[in-house]
Amino acid sequence: MQHGELVAVTTSIGLHRELTAASKQPTLQHEMKRRVFAAVFNIDKVISTFTGRPPMMSQACSSTSLPLDLSDEALLSGDLLAAAAELDSHGWNKYGRIYSTTILRSRTMFARIRHEILELVQASLDAPSEELVERAMCVFLAEPV
């Protein structure tokens, strides 16, 4: 599958949109949708960075939350609500464990910053704003590991 097709399928099945109610009560379906969307969003920014082309997915048109920092075992255990209750207020696990979703969440947070940088570069602005640099540092410093 080509990247354009991947983005088209992702948006046509609505992975870029999340109902407000979905973000309050985690379910296996919502978490899997978040994981898939985050992975595609990350790929989009990497491809844009290396090809010099504009990103195909707009951050402004997405309402999908980051996936929660849960292990695959916790996600599939059947007691997702209890596992989610063990997370901190930002959705990270409190025990410093590194799961595949930990890396995915982190990459997605940086992909959001990268998206804004790509917009600046594509608009031929000279340098990123101080506010953008400061937010990138905040994301970096807020990493749990």
Spans of features found by a protein language model:
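C-terminal transactivation domains of fungal Zn(2)-Cys(6)
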Residues: 1, 14-31, 43-145
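Extended, hydrophobic alpha-helical segments in both membrane/secreted and soluble proteins
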Residues: 1-11, 36
